[in-house]
């Protein structure tokens, strides 16, 4: 097929279409895997959570109501120090830079979050989806970055609440790591509710959870054209030293 080997592979609800690409190395051509196309979906109807990794598995469960199954957060946890969210489920073994991530969200408190471009517990973005405007609550309702220190807002101060009530809402995160664009959509309006250009983290995992409250998720769908993120420039990340990071993680993981 024009020199490209194409195969179909399914695991944990994922379907990927990898192709073989060519890269110029020195004076010769060397074959290397091209970024893989990825489609993942989880409606939790199977009753299994094999596709997800949790900081505290006992805090999460699948609930059935009226024949519909969804992921429920039973318990919130204290944020980490430096102050940032820790209570979110990550999609196992999947990293992407260019992607569309969609999910249905329902809050029990005032807010929930969607995490993306997750590198480690001190380096990631998250969309904070709140009942509040950022003008009323400076750390609510917007896109935030955790970059080795306390979370910081990068956009969304004037946006309307992403989750104005305790009903289900459809949320979508669109990310293009090449252009740096991040757009977050909520069904409360037609266009993006939050938009920003930021290239700090070009690749990482995706997750769903809350800063310090509880709620529900359903119908998670991820579509990406660069699963695996070849050559992510993670060297640009400003990291704290490894010993300090391990001490901080050990401290923040205590009940």
What would you call each of these model-derived segments?
Residues 44, 220-222:
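Extracellular beta-strand elements of beta-rich domains used
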Residues 48-77:
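Extracellular glycan-recognition surfaces and repeat-rich motifs
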Residues 44, 103, 167-195:
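Carbohydrate-binding surfaces in secreted/extracellular proteins
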Residues 193-219:
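Flexible glycan-contacting loops in extracellular carbohydrate-active proteins
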Residues 148-170:
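Short, aromatic/His-centered strand-loop micro-motif at the edge of beta-sheets
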Residues 78-146:
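Secretory/extracellular carbohydrate-interaction modules
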Residues 3-4, 8-11, 233-255:
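Short, low-complexity, charge-dense intrinsically disordered segments
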Residues 32-56, 227-231:
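Extracellular carbohydrate-recognition regions
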């Amino acid at each position: 097929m024009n020199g490209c080997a194409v195969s179909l592979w399914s695991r944990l609800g994922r379907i990927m279409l990898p192709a073989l690409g060519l890269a110029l190395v020195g004076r010769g051509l060397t074959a290397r895997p091209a970024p893989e196309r990825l489609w993942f979906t989880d409606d939790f109807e199977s009753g299994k959570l094999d596709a997800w990794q949790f900081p505290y598995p006992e805090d999460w469960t699948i609930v059935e109501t009226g024949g519909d199954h969804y992921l429920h957060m039973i318990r919130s946890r204290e944020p980490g120090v430096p102050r940032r969210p820790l209570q979110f489920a990550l999609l196992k073994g999947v990293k992407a830079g260019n992607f569309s991530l969609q999910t249905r969200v329902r809050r029990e408190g005032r807010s929930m979050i969607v995490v993306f471009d997750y590198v480690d517990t001190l380096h990631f973005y998250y969309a904070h989806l709140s009942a509040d405007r950022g003008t009323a609550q400076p750390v609510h309702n917007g896109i935030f970055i955790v970059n080795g220190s306390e979370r910081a807002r990068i956009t969304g101060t004037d946006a309307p609440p992403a989750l104005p009530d305790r009903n289900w809402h459809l949320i979508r995160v669109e990310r293009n790591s090449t252009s740096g664009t991040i757009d977050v959509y909520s069904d409360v309006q037609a266009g993006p509710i939050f938009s920003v250009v930021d290239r700090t983290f070009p690749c990482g995992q995706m997750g769903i959870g809350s800063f310090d409250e509880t709620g529900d998720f359903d119908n998670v769908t991820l579509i990406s054209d660069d699963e695996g993120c070849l050559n992510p420039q993670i060297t640009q990340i400003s990291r704290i030293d490894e010993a300090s990071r391990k001490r901080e993680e050990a401290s923040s993981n205590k009940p």
